Amino acid sequence: MSAAAYMDFVAAQCLVSISNRAAVPEHGGAPDAERLRLPEREVTKEHGDPGDTWKDYCTLVTIAKSLLDLNKYRPIQTPSVCSDSLESPDEDIGSDSDVTTESGSSPSHSPEERQDSGSAPSPLSLLHSGVASKGKHASEKRHKCPYSGCGKVYGKSSHLKAHYRVHTGERPFPCTWPDCLKKFSRSDELTRHYRTHTGEKQFRCPLCEKRFMRSDHLTKHARRHTDFHPSMIKRSKKALASPL
């Protein structure tokens, strides 16, 4: 038996008990003997005092009213209905956010269609629209490679231009060393190459006297020292950048 059915059963028992009891006669009245025969037996067996019978009668009435009032508000089905109504907008919002994030386009439902539907926008939908607009602006700042099959994305247009030269084969940075015909697509590549002609090794190990043309070669070498720390290379770079 469920809790609600049990409450109905107890309330019914209380009402039946109330109906089987009779009111206590006032002082000086002569009630009918037949009508008071059953209550007198109950009073004799259970209480033995008419005052106790009246208290028991009032208690039963109070319990019955309380059970009937509680039975009007059953908290069994209400949470399920509310949870369904609250979860469905979140599911719709999540589907729209996935489309906006992956494709970078706005959701299929336009603001005009939402207004025509007659439903007022909830605070969650307004908050999500603000997050989606920020994500859209962030995606517009990205620079995607237009070459078919590449799909790489860069945060700066200069990085995209340098990368696109890999597909086109363009090398606008030639080496100016005599009799050197090499060309490069990036200026930093030309700088590193030019040091091979000059013999310049400006990256010195902070723990020994070795020098290197490239910073990555220096880092790889310095990690072999047991007392090495990355901050040592940063300090050496600042010293080279400062004027003598």
Curated annotation (Swiss-Prot):
UniProt keyword annotation of DNA-binding present: yes
Residue positions, PTM Phosphoserine: 122
InterPro entries membership: Znf_C2H2_sf (IPR036236), Znf_C2H2_type (IPR013087)
Zinc finger extent (C2H2-type): 143-167, 173-197, 203-225
Gene3D superfamilies xrefs: Classic Zinc Finger
Residue span of region Disordered: 24-51, 79-143
Alphabetized SMART domains for the sequence: ZnF_C2H2 (SM00355)
Keyword Nucleus: yes
Keywords: Biological rhythms, DNA-binding, Metal-binding, Nucleus, Phosphoprotein, Repeat, Transcription, Transcription regulation, Zinc, Zinc-finger
Protein localization: Nucleus
GO molecular function, one term: DNA-binding transcription factor activity
Main subcellular localisation: nucleus
One GO cellular component term noted in the UniProt record for this chain: nucleus
Family: Belongs to the Sp1 C2H2-type zinc-finger protein family.
Subunit note: Interacts with ZZEF1.
Protein's job: Transcription factor that binds to GC box promoter elements. Selectively activates mRNA synthesis from genes containing tandem repeats of GC boxes but represses genes with a single GC box. Acts as an epidermal circadian transcription factor regulating keratinocyte proliferation.
Protein name (database record): Krueppel-like factor 9
This protein's encoding gene: Klf9
